[in-house]
Amino acid sequence: MIESKNQSFFPNRFDCVVVGAGHAGSEAAYISSKGGARTLLITMNLDTIGQMSCNPAIGGIAKGHMVREVDALGGIMGKMIDNTGIQFKMLNTSKGPSVWAPRAQAEKKEYQLKVKHTLEAEKNLSIRQDTVEELIIENDQVIGVRTGRGFEIFTNHVILTTGTFLSSLVHIGTYQNENGRMCEPTVKGLSKSLAKYNLKLGRLKTGTPPRIHKNSVDLSVLTIQEGDSNPSPFSFSTDKITRKQIPCFITYTNAETHKLIHENLNLSPMYSGQIQSTGPRYCPSIEDKVVRFADRERHQVFLEPEGYETSEIYLNGVSTSLPEEVQWKLVRSLKGLENAEIVRPGYAIEYDYVDPTELKPTLETKKIKGLYHAGQINGTTGYEEAAAQGLVAAYSVLHSLRNLTPLLFKRSESYIGVLIDDLVHKGVEDPYRMFTSRAEHRLLLRQDNADQRLMKYGYDLGLVDQKSYDCMKEKYERVNSVREKIYQIPLKPSDKFQNLLDQKGITNYKFGMKLDSFLKRPEIKIKDIEFMIPEVSSWSDLEKSILEMEIKYEGYIKRELETIQWKNKYLDLAIPEDINYEMIAGLKKEAIQKLKSHKPMTLEKASQISGVDPSDVDLILYHIKGKKKQEVEIF
């Protein structure tokens, strides 16, 4: 260790130290410094700040919702992808609006550099290349960190965002190496430091697919997948996406692929016993897919370009840790990839995590004051889940530094609230991934209204500027004003209206009925009736969507709000000891197993069991109260 007197020539005291510069660390460092805290970000490699370690994409089902929420709260992920995306799509538009979700392919290296440059521009943020090997604790309070090169940095607030680097081990067949990502060193000392203070550590596994050379693929025989013609931005501050979009492609596994995998399962670290830790349930390896879904004749594989100029293509759906020579055979068994060249092999990686039930809802550890965890160290998977946690941890630090009451995100107001509540109360048994099904109030948590739900918190901390906040308020004032007008406008005969009726094939209507009732018809969109409310013609697509959703689904929204109040009354409701969960129609098999094992005494305790979703708790409540689910079903 370098003596303190030799450290006087450089700053070694900060309000907050963030360890790790992935998606959790980048958000944490940005929010902390933007909020006025003198912040130090420590990363083992400045060139990998904000790196996309796995898929080159941001967003997706529920994940896109969280990116919008992070943006509304002042975070950077939404802005970064808007500036570096190469294909944008709104997913699930054929379903209800609660599950619509933005997703974008990224120009991978450009995204990483954009994050790095954004952080470098923050005046309250210092960035240093080093590792953190040990926490410095006194009287159960963190007072600093000790780095790999022996320097001591002092602070009362540390946010650990260590990703997959804690005592990590890479597997490719029988090959093993102590890496945190392929060819990047692991960090062992920090795991020992955490265990020293009796934080409960566990072991998880994740994986990544091989990358192939674009010029070795016959794209002409593959199914093309284009982006949206009018793409939706992630950030509420982005007016329009103008970047050139490029396509992705789709192929499928086949009988030859599956035969090859079965013949080599004994060489897979997950099936040979080499890997003992648990992998992500909802993002299985191709080996797991073939074994678990043996009745499936094929599995979809997306070919996702990693940028405009690079030749690398990401094979989404073929995560594997089979030996490299088997990976070549596997990839070349796919249509269009018969001559494919692998430039990076797929691999599995095991790493330490800390049981998230060790945390408060602020993401501060219960045992060590001032120590916060965010990202994969909490047992989650995904860039978006990590970014959300990094933001929450930094919010908590800012509230602590300002002696403010901690901000606790509610399940009823955000997916971030669902994420944090699930982690700290239920813990994890496998890497946690967010889904819309985890949110019981998802119709209220649409991706289009994240700013209305959350921006006030960012504004209060100075993380959202006055102009952005005023624009948000003015937007919803416009929406509310026109919505009230629509309630009053009667349908009247006109040539334009008759043309609309003829176009839609509508005959069952009455003149005099109000416009809101007409808009609630499934075949009618807000764009169809703009001639009756001309003021909306200048609105953004997002504003029009909000207006349409709030009118079309106002009955469901009202019932959802009533349901929140109704359910809150029954959290302490006792569950009968003799309840037969197998007799409750619709209850998931996993939930039945967990409920029978844990034997919760109340609905609240049932809701805190990992694997028991809000919809399962609803079914139990309806069963106990003797109500039929369809009588109170939430949209």
From Swiss-Prot:
<dbReference type="Pfam" id="PF21680">
    <property type="entry name" value="GIDA_C_1st"/>
</dbReference>
<dbReference type="InterPro" id="IPR036188">
    <property type="entry name" value="FAD/NAD-bd_sf"/>
</dbReference>
<dbReference type="InterPro" id="IPR004416">
    <property type="entry name" value="MnmG"/>
</dbReference>
<keyword id="KW-0285">Flavoprotein</keyword>
<dbReference type="InterPro" id="IPR044920">
    <property type="entry name" value="MnmG_C_subdom_sf"/>
</dbReference>
<dbReference type="InterPro" id="IPR002218">
    <property type="entry name" value="MnmG-rel"/>
</dbReference>
<dbReference type="InterPro" id="IPR049312">
    <property type="entry name" value="GIDA_C_N"/>
</dbReference>
<dbReference type="Pfam" id="PF01134">
    <property type="entry name" value="GIDA"/>
</dbReference>
<keyword id="KW-0520">NAD</keyword>
<dbReference type="InterPro" id="IPR047001">
    <property type="entry name" value="MnmG_C_subdom"/>
</dbReference>
<keyword id="KW-0819">tRNA processing</keyword>
<dbReference type="InterPro" id="IPR026904">
    <property type="entry name" value="MnmG_C"/>
</dbReference>
<dbReference type="GO" id="GO:0005829">
    <property type="term" value="C:cytosol"/>
</dbReference>
<comment type="subunit">
    <text>Homodimer. Heterotetramer of two MnmE and two MnmG subunits.</text>
</comment>
<dbReference type="InterPro" id="IPR040131">
    <property type="entry name" value="MnmG_N"/>
</dbReference>
<dbReference type="GO" id="GO:0030488">
    <property type="term" value="P:tRNA methylation"/>
</dbReference>
<dbReference type="GO" id="GO:0050660">
    <property type="term" value="F:flavin adenine dinucleotide binding"/>
</dbReference>
<dbReference type="GO" id="GO:0002098">
    <property type="term" value="P:tRNA wobble uridine modification"/>
</dbReference>
<keyword id="KW-0963">Cytoplasm</keyword>
<keyword id="KW-0274">FAD</keyword>
<protein>
    <recommendedName>
        <fullName>tRNA uridine 5-carboxymethylaminomethyl modification enzyme MnmG</fullName>
    </recommendedName>
</protein>
<feature type="binding site">
    <location>
        <begin position="20"/>
        <end position="25"/>
    </location>
    <ligand>
        <name>FAD</name>
    </ligand>
</feature>
<dbReference type="InterPro" id="IPR020595">
    <property type="entry name" value="MnmG-rel_CS"/>
</dbReference>
<comment type="similarity">
    <text>Belongs to the MnmG family.</text>
</comment>
<comment type="function">
    <text>NAD-binding protein involved in the addition of a carboxymethylaminomethyl (cmnm) group at the wobble position (U34) of certain tRNAs, forming tRNA-cmnm(5)s(2)U34.</text>
</comment>
<dbReference type="Pfam" id="PF13932">
    <property type="entry name" value="SAM_GIDA_C"/>
</dbReference>
<feature type="binding site">
    <location>
        <begin position="279"/>
        <end position="293"/>
    </location>
    <ligand>
        <name>NAD(+)</name>
    </ligand>
</feature>
